[in-house]
């Protein structure tokens, strides 16, 4: 099934087209989400939300970009929304603890292994993802899409709605920052 047929099938409510979409893109969407949220359960939730949003809003897809670009954009946005809500909950939890009202522990990121990274040692994988988590938002997105999802700079620029030179700059700064973070940890 080519992309045009898939889009037409999705817009007509064809169940087989939706199943094909999920089967084709679920691993890629999950890998993108886990690269950003760094939690397997949250990444699964994000992936489900992406497909629900596609199901509900496919009629709004104008075809100005590839379907995969649209999916990555939704996955990135949903992942960032989750991180932002998590940060606001952490801030609120800190305020509650200051005033003695918060009895629940703050959410901590568990250790996990990203399915898209094949490293010999789990320790290296954990260090890498800890370092990626410290990157500024746009650098984290560009790095995740390029290194974990193997998207080209052109594809990343479409997902992030920016220019290719901007993506190149983000990748350069992400690599520099990761190098600094990882060097600091080995000292």
Predicted regions and their residues:
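Short, charged helix-capping/linker segments at alpha-helix termini
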Residues: 11-20, 30-49, 164, 186-187
